[in-house]
Amino acid sequence: MVYKLCIFLAAAISGAWMATQDLAARLQYDGILGEPSFFYMDHPYYAPWRYYGWYRDLHAYIPGIFQKTYFYLYGGLLIGVLLLFFLQKKPRLTSHGSAHWGEYDDIVKMDLVSASGVVVGLYDNGFKRFCTKILRKLELCKNEKVAYAELAFDREQEDRMERGHAKLQRLEDALATVKNTKKKQALQRQKEKLERRLAHPLRYDAKRDSFLSVYPYVWLHKALQKLLMRQKHFYLRDNSNKHLAVIAPTRSGKGVGLIIPTLLGSWKESVIVNDIKSENWGITAGYRKRMGQIVVKFEPTAEDGSSARWNPLEEIPIGKPGEIAAAQNLAYILANFEGKEKLDHWGANAALVITVVILHLIYAHYADPKNYPNFPSLYKVAAFLKSNVVPKIDEEGRPVQKTVDGVLVEEVDAKGFLDTLKSLKDFEHVPEGGIEIREWSKEKRAYVMRHFDASDLREIYPQAQSIERMPHTHPIIYQNFIEILSKPDNECGSIISTANTALKEYLDPTLAMNTSCSDFCIDDAMNERRPMSLYLVTPPSDLLRLAPIFRLFFEMMVQHHAKRIGKYEHGRAKALYKHKCLFLMDEFSSLGNLKSFAATLSYIAGYGMKVFLINQGLPQINAIYGRDNQILMNCHLQIIYAPNDNDTGKYAESLIGQQTIQVESETARGGWGLSNKDYTKSETGRALITADEIKRLGEEELIIASGSPPIRTDKVKYYETNYFLKKLVDAPAVSDVIRQQPNPLRERLIRQKKHERKLEAAKEKVFRYEPEG
């Protein structure tokens, strides 16, 4: 509407200006007209609104001259009206549906025009899109030419190889019969030369083998590609607080079009990346570190020290009122290793067992560092459930000691889990004199010690029945030990078996090493001084085995950061977090069943967490979460690539809706060559894009948002523009760490990389001769 008004005013003002200049010329620029507005090439020009002042003052004296200027005045108005008429859009038909493709104004309303955010598509002007299509067609033509030429080259190469082997056989036969030494040496040289050629056959090269027929296409493609790589492109970015979902089959370009462009600087806040195969780390970690972010790689299977370590047990605030809730949440996630919507009897009781073991081991580490020297990890919890070594106690409750090589040591017993509980049910978790709890201080950026004694324990659990008679024993641990021991042996055995199954993966020594302590914590992602880029890396071979620990991470992340939405000042909420965090969950379904996490999608956006889910197809989601899942419903923006399955195509077709089209039908009447034809027009409905058309999208994608028309636009390919290519730098050799803790493997790897860089620098060093004097 605004641009139409501007067009009309431009025509009207132009007419008024021409009338003003014509009137001034007819009056020979008399002084009565006043001073001109400006001069151009010694010619006076008057502002168009001066005409109306002259009309008021002079029309009564020279009406005839004014009449001669009406042609321009009314002509401008007429042209403006005609322009409005011809620019009027044809009314859109809506009787059977009003679906239509979105345009630039719709993109602006969808908040996809942003300087930063998640890259969702490419929206170039018509000329650049035309050039890109030419490049893609030229690439197909080049590939076809190269393929045929390579096939012909391979056939010729096979013939050459056959002739070469035949010649080699003849040389060997000749060598066996020739007696002359010189001739034999010459034949031997020929044989060696031929063997080298046969051992290293030539490969097809378009410039060498098809210079006239194929190489022009290769050269033209490279030249046009270089030209387009220098051009600036318009990328659509989503920087809202709403979630996104991508449905794109494997090898469809979602990595090069969405993930990598987003990580190469488009998203400037914190990000957590589910990085299968470590591709995203290798391509984008270097640039994100250059952005000033903390770049962390958590790879549970890493054996070289390049990965940061994370111990979920260190997330529990020991000696504080929230310790039970944190331990219960952690244990529930661990027990629910299959991602069920609700745990059954055995799973719920297994969570209880894991809870009490976690709390006991942490307190025991502080209370009895001699027998529990290291802070517990998931490996220690799993091992504790298997069997234990505990001090041997005599009838009076005192440790039994013996002399070994002249040294007095305590005797120990190897016991099963239930036997261990019986001997530990009266364990003093907060002995006389208290304990010193080690915790991380963000202000000091170091570990500090906090004293905790029996009075602090009583303050946290004032209503516990056992606290009066057993002031040094943790009441919750004691009560749960008694509850477990009171269960029938068969039931207790099944519960412990369920707990062992849930924790079996953590007995892997490599996984145990990488979860033994924490180089970072989940709070750092949103509250560290600088934004953090965290890559959760796992090789495809270990995907199913390690899915539970990544599910654990994401669910703990949500539970930790979704406790309080913020504090209110002057009636407005002020966020508690320092940085927003993007959950970039590539191959979301590979993480297994995350029903509890999926249920949080409806509210976690308000806590600064934005989820970017990427799946291969709708059947993949339905197989895990059921057909009535609400995952896609909670994602405001949905991006559809050409799918491989029918369900995704039908889903997108129904989501986009129908348009109304006008069809013309022809009816013939009469006969004997005198027939007449009647034409009738009617309206009918048609899908704006059908399922089979969606499967043929090719280099295009669909962007669908609730409340807005769908956008049909081009895919991004980061390697086709220098804007992204210039950001490709080497990834760090080792992960950054926030909490400095001893890690010999990491330190050794750093020294090794430094030594390798020195050797490379020495090789590249250029020595110059500088004459003396």
Language-model region placement:
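Alpha-helical transmembrane segments and their helix-start/interface "positive-inside/aromatic belt" motifs
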Residues: M1-A12
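P-loop NTPase motor domains
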Residues: G15, A19-T20, A24, Q88-H100, ...
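Membrane-interfacial helical/loop segments at transmembrane boundaries in membrane proteins
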Residues: A24-P63
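Transmembrane alpha-helices and immediately adjacent membrane-cytoplasm interface residues
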Residues: R56-R92
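Charged, low-complexity interaction regions
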Residues: D173-A186, L202
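Conserved ATP-driven motor cores of ASCE-family P-loop NTPases powering translocation/secretion/packaging/pilus
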Residues: L601-Y603, Y607-L702, K765
